[in-house]
């Protein structure tokens, strides 16, 4: 039997979901900065680590943004990415994963971080609005099996790195 616990603000702007092997912290607060979100995450993680006897064995920061556009603009983006002319797919997706190594200031501990980017064309409201969009999903995470001691040692650097990676991707893909 799998148990889960979900905590949330009444307005749903902050949710903490506990599953059998993870805790997800999700914010949908409009206009929130990464720094504010990170401060909230730090507080929640500190409360959890103080009150629960579990070590953090993996970190991840995810973000999504939809760029609304007409079908012609969506096809222009596809043509640039696929380098194929005169092709009109009804659905397309591009995914890439880059890796970064984060090391403590003294160089004694390090972790490998995946920077995952996925672009997908999408119809924003199927059946109602035929306007297209491009969905950018980003997932910055540590590798499964990384030492909990190493994760703890680079946790601050991870959050700074992950929020910077996502900010840079949002700016890059807007253009």
Locate each region found by the language model.
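Short, conserved charged micro-motifs
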Residues: 34-36, 71-74, 146-153
């Amino acid at each position: 039997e799998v148990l889960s616990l979900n905590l949330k603000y009444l307005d749903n702007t902050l949710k903490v979901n506990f599953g059998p092997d993870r805790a997800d912290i999700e914010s949908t607060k409009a206009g929130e900065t990464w720094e504010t979100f990170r401060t909230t995450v730090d507080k929640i993680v500190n409360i959890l680590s103080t009150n629960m006897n579990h070590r953090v064995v993996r970190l991840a920061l995810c973000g999504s943004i939809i760029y609304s556009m007409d079908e012609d603009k969506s096809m222009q983006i596809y043509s640039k990415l696929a380098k194929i002319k005169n092709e009109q797919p009804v659905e397309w997706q591009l995914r890439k994963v880059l890796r970064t190594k984060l090391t403590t200031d003294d160089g004694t501990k390090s972790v490998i971080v995946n920077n995952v980017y996925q672009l997908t064309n999408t119809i924003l409201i199927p059946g109602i609005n035929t306007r297209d969009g491009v969905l950018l999903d980003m997932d910055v995470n540590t590798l499964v099996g990384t030492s909990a001691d190493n994760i703890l040692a680079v946790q601050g650097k991870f959050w700074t790195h992950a929020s910077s990676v996502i900010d840079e991707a949002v700016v890059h893909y807007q253009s």
